[in-house]
Design a protein with these regions (language model features):
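Anion-binding alpha/beta catalytic cores of soluble intermediary-metabolism enzymes, centered on
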Residues: 1-71, 77-209
Length: 209
């Protein structure tokens, strides 16, 4: 699940789980996988080549060197390092309050939060009524408003259509971006070089390797 509005894009490691169970569901492997999925979606669905991803911490002050929790040192930092080893531009972990409060989120193409309210509370405060919910990783494009059904105001002419309108526009944009991505990656350039070797090596440009 990715929530986005303009250049602000927020994804989650855990989604609809109780806060009391968030820590036990965080593993290095799970975070690495979410970073990879987020990176792929930013590239394919949002047409951002080599996106910069900020990873939030779980504990206040990023754990304060273990004084307020060890998840950063034992789980999150190793996940970021593994993602970077796979040539993904992942950075952090950042304490959520200072990260959003200082405006640092503007320096990144995407923000990965550890749990639901950590990411969505600041997102909705910043995005206002125009946020969009996007489900990444599906073969189809799926978007929706970033709010609930609102049965309590149904039929009263009180609903704000902006999020629904933006969800429709976003679906069109993502479909277009996927088509561009497919065209861009369909026929990559062949190698135009050879590894350092003997002087009599003959370069054959008809081969990929």
């Amino acid at each position: 699940m990715i929530l986005f509005s303009g250049d602000l894009r927020v994804a989650l490691v855990t989604i609809h789980v109780p806060v009391s169970k968030v820590a036990e569901q965080l593993t290095t492997e799970a975070i690495v996988e979410k970073i990879k999925q987020f990176d792929a979606s930013l590239n394919k669905d949002f047409n951002i080549v080599k996106p910069r991803i900020a990873v939030l911490s779980l504990n206040p002050h990023s754990g304060d060197n273990g004084l307020i929790g060890n998840e950063e040192k034992e789980i999150i930092i190793p996940a970021i390092e593994e993602a970077r080893a796979q040539k993904i531009h992942a950075f952090g972990p950042y304490a959520a309050d200072g990260f959003f409060g200082s405006g640092n989120y503007k320096k990144f193409d995407g923000v990965l939060a550890m749990y639901h309210d950590q990411g969505l509370a600041p997102f909705k405060a910043l995005a206002g009524t125009g946020g969009v919910n996007f489900t990444a990783g599906l073969p189809i494009v799926r978007t929706s408003p970033d709010h609930g059904t609102g049965y309590d105001i149904a039929g009263q002419n009180l609903a704000d259509p902006e999020s629904m309108r933006q969800a429709i526009y976003a679906a069109i944009d993502i479909h277009r971006n996927r088509r561009l991505w497919a065209e861009r990656t369909a026929n990559p350039l062949r190698r135009q070089y050879v590894d350092k070797s003997k002087d009599n090596v003959v370069l054959d440009l008809t081969k990929d390797k």
